[in-house]
A protein has these predicted regions:
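Aromatic-rich, lipid-facing transmembrane alpha helices and their immediate juxtamembrane interface loops
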Residues: 1-388
Length: 388
């Protein structure tokens, strides 16, 4: 397949992600779904409520996923010996690590504290909070990786990550309309319409950088680095990829037609559609190393997103918990999840919802790669250095 045909195939597939849920929704509602176009998203109708059957099935899936991560040897993963690496002089933390600590502390305090100031500074804490956190994570990677991190070695990649992150999360906000707002933002009147678009655009720049910093941080630990890199070798045929691709198309349409039953497809459909499209076009994906038994990229980016998800939910919940429902954080979000909305631990996210982060991380990496392959820039986020 010629290069231009590969690029066109990826663009068409990415376009179908936007069109198929829309077509499904038009068939369902004979028009646009309730709440379509509201930004930020608002809750427009009550979800179906708790379902014991749906919840039980989800628990079974979650249990299997947990077993694979916690006990990989039960599923054919083998222990990989790694020769101890010689340790040189300790690498100090970079300057941006130290600068970011007070920024994070002040931002966190202002977000959670109930201070009556002349200017409502708590409105503007999300972006500095998260970018300082990203720089702290990068500083940890830098120290543990002998001075190698995204900021120190690939600053242009960090800039591109921020740009792609912004546009990719707008894509998820768009898809959210077709599952009738699985998440929504009750503090939508803190800013004007233009203010919401501007501020949320800045906020969305933090998603991909945070996930990839966590991924790189996990890789600096031998425990994670070798845990999933010697597993079952899975080679797939072109026929399988085509079937996998078609399955993604069907799920994307079904998400719009069955917004409650298939709400979870929002986090899953992009994986078969885009990863299969890239594989059919002979592009590298996080699944490519699996043919040699290396599952570490898929597993670690999932874990990285779960770890980061804890902070997303923790800081989000606390921003309203201490404020008696007063609107202080325009980025504050709540969930309206059908069938599974049980068991919250200092979080708006139901406990089972954290498993969705495993797939979300893969989605983010795949979208990043699609952008790189279409716009022809270096997508390699890996950095090398001596690890401990």
């Amino acid at each position: 397949m010629k290069t231009w045909k590969k690029t066109l195939f990826l663009i068409v597939t990415f376009g179908l992600i936007f069109l198929l849920p829309l077509f499904g929704s038009l068939a369902k509602w004979h028009g646009l779904p309730p709440g379509y176009g509201d930004f930020p998203a608002q809750k427009v109708e009550a979800d179906p409520g708790f379902s014991l059957l749906y919840f039980s099935l989800a628990c079974v899936v979650a249990l299997i996923i947990t077993l694979v991560f916690v006990f990989p040897r039960l599923f054919g993963f083998k222990k990989t010996p790694e020769a101890p690496r010689q340790k040189g002089a300790a690498t100090p933390f970079p300057v941006w690590f130290w600068w970011s600590l007070p920024v994070l502390a002040v931002s966190w305090f202002l977000m959670w504290a109930r201070l009556k100031l002349h200017v409502s500074l708590e409105y503007y804490t999300f972006v500095p909070l998260w970018w300082s956190f990203i720089l702290i994570l990068d500083g940890l990677v830098y120290k543990r990786n002998n001075g190698a991190s995204i900021i120190s070695r690939k600053p242009k990649v960090m800039q591109l990550l921020a740009v792609v992150s912004c546009f990719s999360w707008f894509a998820f906000e768009y898809l959210n309309f077709f599952v009738l707002e699985n998440w929504y933002y009750p503090n939508n009147e803190v800013f004007s319409n233009f203010g919401n678009v501007f501020w949320f655009s800045l906020s969305y720049t933090t998603v991909l950088p945070a996930i990839f910093e966590w991924y790189l941080l996990l890789k600096t630990f031998r425990f994670f680095r070798t845990r999933y890199n010697n597993g079952p070798k899975l080679k797939v045929s072109g026929v399988f990829l085509i079937i996998y691709y078609i399955l993604g198309l069907i799920l994307a349409f079904g998400m719009g037609y069955y917004p409650y039953l298939l709400f979870w497809v929002l986090w899953v459909a992009l994986v078969p559609m885009l990863s299969a499209a890239m594989a059919l076009a002979d592009y590298w994906t996080p699944f490519t190393p699996i043919k040699n038994g290396d599952w570490s990229k898929v597993m670690l980016v999932g874990l990285a997103t779960v770890f980061n998800g804890f902070f997303w939910e923790f800081w989000n919940f606390g921003s309203e918990w201490f404020h008696d429902d007063a609107p202080t954080n325009p980025n504050y979000w709540k969930y309206s999840v059908p069938y599974l909305d049980k068991f919250h631990i200092f979080s708006e996210m139901p406990l089972l919802g954290y498993f969705g982060y495993l797939f979300f991380g893969l989605n983010c990496w795949i979208i990043w790669l699609i952008a790189a392959y279409v716009f022809k820039f270096d997508a390699d986020i890996e950095v090398t250095g001596e690890q401990s």
